[in-house]
């Protein structure tokens, strides 16, 4: 059985997005740039992008019929392999679009899932990704079979028949049950591990994907965590014991968030995200050099609220000041954000050239010390 993923050989693709909900032109272009980066990370090359302003995506074909024909003409004349859409498509939308375009159709969710599958290194991460992929595939079985038949030269829309689809549905449901059982066992082990960490305050690095969390983790903990200038370079949770001025605490590097993160991933990565839920302090890292960093800030906050309703103490870290090149001055930006954050600690750093890293460590020290004193007011460890 086949399903739409990016192949190892670089594929030529088109990007398609519906602009709605009051999104301005500048933001729409930045969204497309992100989609192109996702495609590149997965191994594809974006040749051209189509956008259409609509109040909401067309329930049948995502874009209007006229725009779909434009896409078809371009794809036919430019030898395009795949069409990538900037939203999760319903099974019927994928079926209708494939029928019109006769191309591999990839929506945003399967694109991100494919990247996660490439990035997964450990048994834990691979199990979480497989569960998310299976949950995505289950309602789309009919479409996947017709896609396979067309690849093999099948006539029209003939599929393998209802009985074969039902058999595959049962197989996938059984596999989903197995993955959930495996994750349940891993959850138990991780819960025990967290319980064994004792009284140490837990600090979690959070942020949009590719903002420099792993580089910062390496600097603070003086250990080597995989860091790369690619989306979702970190999937596995890394926990390190850090000591600053004789004050020990645990520092966790977590998977990066992204706009329109597939709901299947939030569900299957529960045990990984538990590190965020159970943290005492969050360090929210932002890429100050990114033109859309304010939107990233809101995306991460929204995702954090989805996975944990409790508001935690947070340090806001503005990273990559070495690459900051906006018209507004850095001092003016600092004043604006310090006022906006209403007293929450924030600091401007560069993890690459190590600017203000010592200051960040001092902010961390004071916040961890404050949390420890509240939790253990009669403990003489800090006095």
Task: Put a short name on every predicted segment.
Residues 22-27, 58-61, 119-124, 164, ...:
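Flexible beta-alpha connector loops of hexameric P-loop NTPases
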Residues 45-48, 57-58, 230-260, 281:
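Switch I (G2) and immediately adjacent beta-strands of P-loop GTPase domains
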Residues 19-23, 54-56, 88-91, 110-113, ...:
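Conserved nucleotide-binding/hydrolysis micro-motifs of P-loop NTPases
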Residues 265-290, 306:
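Inter-motif core of Ras-like GTPase G domains
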Residues 195-198, 219-249, 263-271, 293, ...:
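Switch I (effector-binding) loop of TRAFAC-class P-loop GTPase G-domains
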Residues 1-15, 36, 135, 139-211, ...:
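C-terminal-of-GTPase-core extension/linker across diverse P-loop GTPases
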Residues 1-113:
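N-terminal accessory targeting/assembly segments
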Residues 110-129:
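Short alpha-helix plus adjacent loop in nuclease-associated cores
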């Amino acid at each position: 059985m086949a399903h739409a993923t990016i192949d190892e050989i670089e594929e030529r693709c088109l990007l398609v997005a519906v602009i709605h909900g009051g999104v301005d032109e500048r933001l729409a272009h930045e969204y497309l740039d992100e989609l192109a980066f996702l495609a590149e990370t997965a191994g594809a090359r974006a040749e051209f992008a189509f956008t259409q302003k609509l109040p909401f995506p067309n329930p049948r074909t995502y874009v209007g019929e006229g725009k779909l024909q434009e896409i078809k003409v371009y794809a036919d004349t430019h030898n395009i392999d795949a069409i990538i859409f900037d939203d999760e498509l319903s099974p019927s939308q994928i079926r209708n679009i494939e029928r019109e375009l006769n191309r591999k159709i990839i929506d945003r969710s399967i694109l991100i899932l494919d990247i996660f599958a490439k990035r997964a290194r450990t048994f834990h991460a691979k199990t979480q990704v497989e569960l998310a992929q299976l949950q995505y595939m289950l309602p789309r079985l009919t479409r996947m079979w017709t896609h396979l038949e067309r690849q093999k030269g099948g006539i029209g829309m003939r599929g393998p028949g209802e009985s074969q689809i039902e058999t595959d549905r049962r197989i996938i449901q059984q596999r989903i049950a197995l993955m959930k059982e495996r994750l349940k066992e891993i959850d138990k082990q991780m819960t025990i591990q967290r319980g064994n960490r004792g009284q140490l305050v837990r600090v979690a690095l959070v942020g949009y994907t590719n903002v420099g969390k792993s580089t910062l983790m390496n600097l603070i903990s003086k250990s080597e965590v995989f860091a790369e200038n690619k989306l979702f370079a970190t999937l596995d949770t890394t926990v390190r014991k850090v000591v600053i001025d004789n004050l020990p605490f645990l520092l966790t590097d977590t998977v990066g968030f992204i706009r329109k993160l597939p709901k299947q991933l939030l569900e299957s990565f529960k045990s990984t995200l538990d590190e965020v839920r159970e943290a005492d302090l969050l360090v929210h890292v932002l890429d100050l050099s990114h033109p859309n960093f304010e939107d990233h800030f809101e995306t991460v906050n929204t995702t954090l609220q989805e996975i944990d309703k409790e508001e935690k103490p947070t340090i806001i870290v503005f990273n990559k000041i070495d690459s900051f090149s906006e018209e507004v001055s850095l001092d003016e930006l600092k004043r604006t954000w310090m006022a906006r954050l209403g007293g929450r600690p924030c600091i401007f750093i560069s993890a690459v050239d190590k600017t203000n890293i010592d200051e960040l460590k001092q902010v961390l020290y004071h916040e961890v010390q404050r949390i420890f004193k509240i939790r253990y007011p009669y403990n003489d460890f800090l006095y």
